[in-house]
């Protein structure tokens, strides 16, 4: 996906015949159309940041390593783990399905700023594909919250006898802090996409004000796209650490074990 739009970025206007063979509706004459270019950037950013780096690092390794390194038989709630997995699976299916709907997938960039995301008819990717993006992200957030709560409860309640908080491996500390950051920040993004859905479907104007299309003013007033930016980046800034901390925790254990030297100061 990233290779396709980077080819067009590196060689603007250049025709690549294999693109026409691979995706004839997206790249007529071997040149990726502008709206499909934006759609690929949006999908790539969303999948990499949320579905791979967030769920892949935190979700996968937390479930594997937290019980193993704490001496617990399993996670605190197997039922919550199951719900988290199936919400994530459903979210992934909906995100992939958005590629095949009329108008194509969401095309507002992975940050989905209004007004492109708030007006269903703004651009081809603002239609059903954008709606599916919002639904997919809402389910992903529910999955992330269920998993994070499970990790926190497991760390606090299921440590083996004699393992105090100060004796936990740094990997577990990284997963714990990541889970706390997720519980504090993901609900804000959930509220942001919920209000965005209201703007799209129910005629509200949380993010819309003084919008003109083809010289005609829309009947929306009182909102501001900046509100969405504030809500989105309330998650966006902690998201950096949600992505980074699990990798740092794992690296600290791998380096300390293979160098046969304890972590300095811990």
In which residue ranges do the predicted regions lie?
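Membrane-embedded and interfacial regions of multi-pass energy-transducing membrane proteins
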Residues: 1-266
